[in-house]
Regions:
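Conserved GNAT acetyl-CoA-binding A-motif
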Residues: 102-113
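A conserved short alpha-helix in the GNAT/GCN5 acetyltransferase fold that borders
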Residues: 86, 95-103
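Helical hairpin unit composed of two closely spaced alpha helices linked by a short loop
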Residues: 77-81, 99, 108
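A short, internal acetyl-CoA/4′-phosphopantetheine-binding micro-motif in the GNAT/acyltransferase core
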Residues: 77-86, 115
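Conserved active-site alpha-helix within GNAT-family acetyltransferase domains
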Residues: 88, 92, 116-131
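A short beta-loop-alpha structural element at the N-terminal edge
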Residues: 1-12
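A conserved beta-strand-loop-helix scaffold within acyl/acetyltransferase catalytic domains
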Residues: 21-79
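Ligand-binding pocket scaffold of soluble enzyme catalytic domains
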Residues: 8-9, 47, 58-59, 90, ...
Length: 131
């Protein structure tokens, strides 16, 4: 993820993917910029699938290091695929890449949040070992 070149395109795709989701689907550039300024933001942990410069899917990670008496935990913070590219395994491939990123950072645990009615997401995450 390159903040100079990907921000607007990612924001547009995020808002499309999560149009139905009140917390995630109506972001303005200021929302994205605020998160990029957070101490936890790492562009190396923001994975994109692109074809000819167009973002087809993404996994944005977050590492929680401020946990009391616990090791840091990696979070699959936002996962999305452009509707035209559903079913191609993009979210799976990027999620695996993100989990491998956590391993390279020495993390032993990963987590995510998913809505209970997101059947495709639940199936994907369960197949990756989340429960």
């Amino acid at each position: 993820f390159d903040t100079a070149t990907h921000k607007q395109q990612w924001l547009d795709l995020n808002n499309q993917v999560f149009a139905h989701h009140p917390d995630q689907g109506n972001w303005a550039m200021a929302d994205l910029d605020n998160r990029i300024k957070e101490d936890w933001f790492d562009p190396q942990g923001f994975f994109l699938a692109t074809e000819k410069g167009v973002i087809e899917g993404f996994v944005w990670t977050k590492i929680h290091q401020d946990l009391v008496n616990q090791d840091p935990v990696g979070e699959l913070y936002v996962v999305g695929t452009a509707p035209a590219h559903h079913g191609r395994g993009i979210a799976r491939a990027l999620s695996v890449e993100a989990i491998n990123y956590f391993v390279t950072k020495g993390l032993k645990h990963a987590m995510l949040y998913v809505d209970a009615d997101n059947e495709k997401g639940l199936k994907l995450y369960q197949s990756l070992g989340f429960n």
